[in-house]
């Protein structure tokens, strides 16, 4: 199975993007590296400036579904698209693990520990026609890493993700206008992640088993902070990789 890594970075994180891109190439993974400066030149950016000019997530992370949609439509059926935030890192054994688990599914998504209604504005539920208990009480996904098998079904889901993300009522931090209040336990909206979670529940999309976390580390700068204080895990393959690459990766974190 041919793998393709998709990443995005603004000027502040171009060094991290370059690092993970070179790492992916060393594993014979293709790369689709998008920059914020490139994104701002697209007609799409001009059309949705009302969302994309917001400083939160460079426009509530709307760019994420856009670049994934752009990249997957350049790939051949049967290939695998792997999106990751540039602040994350993965162990090479992730590749056979995902290939075994994903099988013929259209995608493989990461589930977190947070409850969806605690991190999703009510309008996101309302305007996605997802204002029901199943959506409220499910665990929210983590959109910083996702895997997509290139096929018609995955393209349709990503296109739907992008379509909902273009609706400011759904993706933004604005006050609700749909006539319903946020839940009492609401903390903060999670933008693209809230949308993807609702879609995953609606379409019954596959989520990865917890074992996948043996091969990935999200926000590796935080891992090094815990490592310095003696609080980082040390038993996973990804922990070994982080120890081996500490010097070079800490330079990325500090620069």
Segments from the language model and where they lie:
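Glycosyltransferase catalytic domains, chiefly GT-A lineage
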Residues: 1-255
């Amino acid at each position: 199975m041919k793998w393709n890594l998709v990443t995005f970075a603004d000027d502040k994180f171009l060094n991290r993007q370059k690092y993970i891109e070179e790492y992916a190439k060393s594993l014979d993974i293709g790369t689709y590296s998008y920059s914020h400066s490139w994104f701002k030149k697209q007609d799409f950016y001009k059309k949705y400036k009302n969302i994309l000019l917001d400083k939160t997530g460079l426009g509530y992370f709307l760019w994420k579904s856009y670049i994934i949609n752009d990249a997957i439509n350049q790939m051949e059926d049967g290939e695998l698209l792997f999106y990751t935030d540039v602040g994350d890192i993965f162990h090479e054994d992730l590749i056979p693990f995902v290939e075994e688990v994903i099988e013929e599914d259209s995608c493989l998504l990461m589930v977190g520990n947070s409850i969806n209604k605690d991190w999703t504005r009510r309008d996101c539920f309302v305007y996605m026609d997802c204002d029901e208990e199943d959506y409220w009480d499910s665990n929210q996904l983590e959109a910083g890493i996702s895997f997509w098998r290139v096929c018609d079904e995955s393209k349709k889901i990503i296109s739907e993700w992008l379509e909902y993300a273009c609706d400011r009522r759904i993706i933004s931090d604005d006050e609700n206008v749909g006539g319903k209040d946020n839940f009492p336990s609401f903390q903060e909206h999670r933008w693209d992640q809230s949308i993807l979670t609702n879609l995953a529940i609606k379409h019954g999309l596959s989520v990865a088993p917890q074992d996948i976390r043996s091969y990935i580390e999200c926000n590796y700068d935080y891992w090094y902070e815990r490592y310095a204080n003696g609080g980082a895990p040390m038993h996973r393959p990804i922990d070994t990789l982080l120890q081996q690459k500490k010097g070079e990766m800490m330079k990325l974190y500090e620069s």
